[in-house]
Amino acid sequence: MDSPIFSNDIDSIKNNTYQAKSYQKYNNSNNYNNNNNNSFNNYSNGSNYGGYNNSGNNSNYNNNNNLYNNNNINNNNNNNNNNNINNNNNNINNNNNINNNNSNNNNNNNNNNSNSNNSINSNSYKVNTPTQNGKSSHSPPLINANANVVFPTFKSLDLSSDTVNSVGAANNGSSNSSPTINGISNSNTMNNNNNNNNNNNNNSNSSNNNNNGNNNNNNNYNSFVNITKNNNNTNSNNYNNSTNSNNNGYNNNNNNNSISNSNSNSNSNSNSNSNSNSNSNSNSNSNSNSNSNSSSNSSSSSNNNNNNNNNNNNNNNSSSSSSNSNGNNNNNYHSYGYSNSKYNQQKSYNNAPHQLNSGGGQNSYYNKNNYNNGNGNIGNGNNSGSGNSSNSNGWSGGYQKQNGANRYQSQSQQQPQQQQQQQPQQPQQPQQQQQQQQQQQQQQQQQQQQQQQQQQQQQQQQQQQQQQQQQQQQPPQQQQQQQQDIGDSSRMNGGSRVPKAPGSDIGFNRGLNNSLNGQTDLNNSNYNSNSNNNNTNNNNTNNNLVNGKLQHYNYNNSSFKFNKNAQYNNGNNNGNNNNNNNNNNNNNNNNNNNSNNNSTNNNNINNSGNNNISNSVSSNSNGNVGSNPHRFQKNHFEKPFNSNSSTPSTPPNSTPSSSTTTSPSSSFNTYSNTFNNGSSNSFNNGSFNNSFNNGSSSNGSFNHGSFNNGSSISSFSGSFNNGSSGSGFNASFNGGSNSNSFNNGDNNNNNNNNNNNNHHNNDIDDSEPIIDQLDSTGEEEMDNLIGKLDLFSTKSESLFHTWKLNYSNRNNNNNNNSNNNNNNNNSSNNNSNSNNNNDNNNNDSFDGSNSDSQNIETDRTTTKVYITGKNFNNHNNNNNNNNNNNNHHYNNNNNNNNNNNNNNNNNNNNNNNNNNNNNNNNNNENNNGDVFSNGFSTWTPKSGSNSLNNSQNNLSNGQNSSNNSQNNLNNSQNSLNSSGNHHSNYHGHNNHHHYNNNNNNNNNNNNNNNNNNNNNNNGNGYVKSYYNNKYQQKSPQHQSSNSVVLIPPPGFSTIAPPPGFSTNNNNNNNNNNNNNNNKNNNSNNNNIIEVGKANYQTSTLNNSQDDSYQQEQEQQEQESQQQQQQQQQQQQQQQQQQQQQQQQQNYSSTPPNITPHLKGDGGLEKWFGNNIYSFGASQSLNNENTNPSYSYVPYNNNNNNNNNFNNINNDNNDNDIINNNHQQTNPSLQNDTPPIKMLSLEEIERW
């Protein structure tokens, strides 16, 4: 409050009251607010809410968020595309946030996150917050509070309660169950939404302000205040509108920016980064491009908006993007943003932070950016927040005045504390100046006040944290001293005022992250991630705020393992993502945090995701680290993974996130990160973050790299990124994304996805081999099946984890996508690159596949498992693949995107894709192939590392792009939003295509970027989808396909097409949406991947590339309907072949020009969604028991789903997941795709 910048406004805010406290944070937020992230975080202040937000958003994982996003999107739609974008970002990021963002969109966004409003929410919601448990998680109330969005869908998803609980708890915070994809997340999201809206508005205001830059800020603040009063909501809307409008233009951008949220958006931030990614180029590019990208980012730019804000910052944002490069800028901003007065120092600070930022830098920078924006990025800040991390931290920390930022660092020491601390320590609220922990505590206290329930939990946690704090507090004490110096500004920043500690820059982020991440933080982290992603937002706030609650939430996420977290991440991511995207872009920034994360996240993400895994975060540092982490991860997969985490190897659901959180989170986080990244990353990271993060140093190097890693990793998650990621991991698996998708996602990621995954994971019972289960259960209900389905025991553990990992990756992917961006960006080539990447990825994927195949070779069960894993990876991959295949196509899409968006965006997107690919590739490779195998067999970073790094960098760019994309995406999503479209996608393959097209169109309209984001999201979503499928299957859309979902080949979830293929296609579709890419996507989608033996073959459907393809598809769909009737008759005649004819009655003709591959006797064909799995019993089975060949034909539908996701992705992850679920057949694809038939035991055996 004291900070000069805000003081007046703040005063007014104070006067305004009630939010005042929040506002302080909020203000910070405000600053934040814009930051949102921070703000958000702080704001979240609402700790509660904020936390909530985080959690919500974050937690919400992306999925939720995403899903929410959809809502968001819708909201966005309402709000603006930008909002959407924000959403996207948010989506990714928070989705929630975004959503909120969305809602606010602009506000985004930013605020979204920030909003997250949360804070407000928190106020409003504090009650909800208590939902902390997760039971409440659904916290529909939150939703109610928002009253805007309804997430019934999620509810319909109805994740398993425990999952939910976990999530919830994690989420918890927020509604958090949000973590559950279900409503909770939604709720959170919703809340966020509202909040966001509110906040957003707030933020938005901020954002807008941001956009408007400071003025707005002031206004913002004012508005903000109003908002505050409004609770945001009004404001938000109000503001929102205003903002949007306001921004719009910028707003849009803003939104986007807001996104900047997007800055978040993605950071746009990311984008911002992304460009940034561009990285630096972004930097310059960043800025410039950054803007451009940014712009596209612009969206990001919109970021810009942030830009505006940024634009103020702008560029900052963009810068951010660039920033990434910006990083510094951000940092600068960061500092800059922080308080004007502080600026200079801050800048310096920044500089250090730059790296820092990188760590958080991005964020920071983002933050800065945002921050700068005054808020404005604030929102971004969010992102930055993600920058979060840094931002968030950075933010808080960073901004924290330089001191603060530095202060953060010590936090890094505190990470463990924060991890635990994030759960509310009860610092003196009054003294925000005190350590973040204290602040967090303060916030947490507020939250606690607001959320006694949470407090209880948190208190418990706090006790732990306090213990840790006691251990670590000394440094914090030092920090306190410094912080005191910082005084208000830190507070303003987000209150996380950790005193600067030596090395604080890094520490700062890290600390932040850590703290955010805190593993527990982890959750936080996640949150962070989210937070981070949100990170900033969240992070910071989240952190703090979150910490308390959110953290808690995260915490659960952690439990979620990453899934949840990841999602959360996504959420975070989303959160961040949101932020990242949101800035999540915030999201990321959320995504990353992403960015944040990304940045960190990226790190994270880049960490992957993979890194994410990598911890990447550290890695994120990517890349390398990432890779190492990746490897590390691998180890995780190996038992080490399990062992690594104290967490039982059991699926995350068992994961204790808390105590273990750190490590498991770590792993999870890692994942999460990824996921986070995913979403966020993706975009967050992507851009900026990444880039930034990666960005080289910033990124990586610094970023986290060390930093991240450094500590973080220690935190591993901690890594800030991880933190986010860590959480991220969580997130990732959390998942996200977006989702992530996570953040968590299960974002976002990616997030829900992750979440879902997590959930799923949670749901999954590794104890018994699936097959056994299947045998025993026979055609047991899908839910049950799926729960178990996941994996076969032995491997399942590792696999499971792996799966999660992959999941993360998925998030990652998102991130990756972002990364791709990079890569692509790395070339803009993108396309080329992408393609190359894709190819590589594909190759990698294939390689991975090979690995996978090898795994497959080991035994069917294994095979299945692996495949599943792969799929998951693919999922992740999906993103990756998406990226991969997608990349290929996706790239194309990207290309399209590029075309549409800008090339930049597209590039970014492409890059993202590629990046993802890279990541994925690497990841994929790692994740995909690698992941697949990677996930399983080698987690070696393989190219993943480098790629990952690249990816990461790219990712950052990607993120930027992504952000942009996200922005675009949001826009697209708005279009998409049109869930109708979305649904349409569901509804028909063609539709889907169309949908994509819509997307495309939207993308086109919005930018392909959006699509890209979608893609990114897709990745997240995809996985998620799987998870959700289980739940989703219930959803009406999926009803027909329930069984389908139910039955992927064992070990395959619907999601689990051969690795990523389906996903790829999905992505492709997304891409597809994107334009030609659509075609490509279609092609990709069409591509038939055969998994068998070591290699996958992909073929393009003839029609996939034709524009007429869709028409053909439509015709085919019609035909397929007829065929279905015929087939139904025939099938009835063929009962002998299939016991489950009824289930297949709906089985429609294969997608156009695609023929299922049935091989040999017993060959089973299944549509998962439109995907066809062919199992050639005789062919591969006979030939090699171990290598049944799977012909997976990812059909566009998946892509569609992705799109859907994307859409949903906004929905994203949730929906994504759901959509994936859709994939499940894209329920709407029913015509095209019959429900999957259940395998009979016999078949299974044969199979």
Curated annotation (Swiss-Prot):
Bias (Basic residues): 984-995
UniProt biased composition (Pro residues): 1047-1060
GO biological-process terms attached to the record: positive regulation of transcription by RNA polymerase II
Compositional bias per record (Low complexity), positions renumbered to this chain: 26-125, 169-178, 185-223, 230-341, 363-375, 385-394, 409-431, 472-484, 523-544, 553-628, 655-667, 738-759, 807-855, 871-928, 943-983, 996-1021, 1064-1087, 1110-1122
Region (Disordered): 25-141, 169-431, 472-667, 738-770, 807-857, 869-1087, 1099-1122, 1139-1162
GO CC field: mediator complex
GO molecular function: transcription coactivator activity
Residue ranges with Polar residues bias: 126-139, 342-356, 511-522, 929-942, 1026-1044, 1099-1108
Source organism superkingdom: Eukaryota
Name of protein: Uncharacterized protein DDB_G0283357
